[in-house]
């Protein structure tokens, strides 16, 4: 009798083990392709960015009211848990995110199924794309012009368009500021790339299309690793000294807040 009980117990354990293994295999089986949505949530420090209605004070005791925050993101690459990288189609990989228009979402289509652990993207337009000439820009040239992200074709794209007003201890009257950063043709290359760990795996399959929520901290543009005082210079555009510092600060303003995994119907 004891032998029968022992056999039944072993059979039960094996059945549970096989069942669990089967469930695990099903849970990790990702096939097909789907979209990955990137939500850029603009902030100032720990506060939400509210254009024209809220004021923010930086570490240099300058109080800013921000009226525009537009930036170009491009050249997306996703790396999976096996160390394999999927590079998004280059011609389709240029986007303007604009707090002004409310267009802060980037949708990457036709991403192969997988478990993705990090994302890489550019801030701005790379020289390879720019040197294709105006005829090689496709629809993105029109998008950039319509969102105030161009100087002229010869001068190039504005990678960042950051505007508003400010006051400080030395500038007591409300004063306009403008920070426009770009590569200025091919003579000064301010294009930067950012790589971020997702923290939580982004799962892509024919039934799963994750949303990655990123935070862009506008405070870092002037108050990041490189401190830039509006009281000293309230307009920064074609500056061989300060524009590269703005580019470095801007590239550092992005973090991943969280990843939402789910089916398209559940979003």
Regions found by a protein language model. Name each.
Residues 1-9:
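Bacterial N-terminal signal peptides that target proteins for export
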Residues 21-267:
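A short, solvent-exposed, low-complexity linear motif enriched for acidic/polar residues
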Residues 16-19:
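C-terminal motif of bacterial Sec signal peptides marking the signal peptidase cleavage site
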């Amino acid at each position: 009798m004891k032998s029968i009980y022992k056999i039944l117990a072993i059979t039960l354990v094996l059945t549970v083990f096989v069942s669990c293994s089967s469930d695990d295999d099903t849970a990790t089986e990702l096939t097909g392709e789907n979209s990955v949505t990137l939500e850029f949530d603009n902030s100032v420090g720990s506060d939400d960015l509210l254009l024209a209605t809220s004021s923010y004070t930086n570490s240099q005791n300058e109080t800013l009211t921000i009226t525009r925050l537009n930036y170009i993101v491009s050249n997306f690459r996703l790396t999976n848990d096996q160390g394999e990288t999927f590079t998004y189609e280059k011609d389709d990989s240029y986007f303007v995110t604009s707090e002004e228009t409310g267009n802060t979402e980037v949708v990457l289509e036709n991403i192969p199924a997988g478990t993705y652990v990090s994302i890489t993207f550019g801030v701005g337009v790379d020289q390879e794309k720019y040197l294709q000439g105006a005829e090689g820009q496709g629809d993105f040239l029109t998008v950039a012009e319509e969102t105030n992200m161009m100087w002229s074709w010869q001068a190039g794209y504005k990678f960042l368009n950051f505007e508003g007003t400010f006051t400080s201890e030395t500038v007591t009257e409300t004063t306009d500021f403008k920070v426009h950063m770009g590569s200025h043709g091919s003579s000064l290359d301010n294009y930067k790339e950012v790589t971020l760990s997702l923290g939580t795996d982004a799962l892509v399959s024919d039934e799963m299309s994750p949303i990655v929520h990123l935070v862009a901290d506008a405070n870092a543009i002037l108050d990041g690793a490189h401190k830039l005082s509006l009281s000293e210079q309230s307009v920064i555009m074609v500056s061989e000294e300060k524009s590269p510092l703005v580019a470095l600060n801007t590239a550092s303003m992005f973090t991943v807040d969280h990843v939402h995994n789910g089916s398209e119907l559940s979003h």
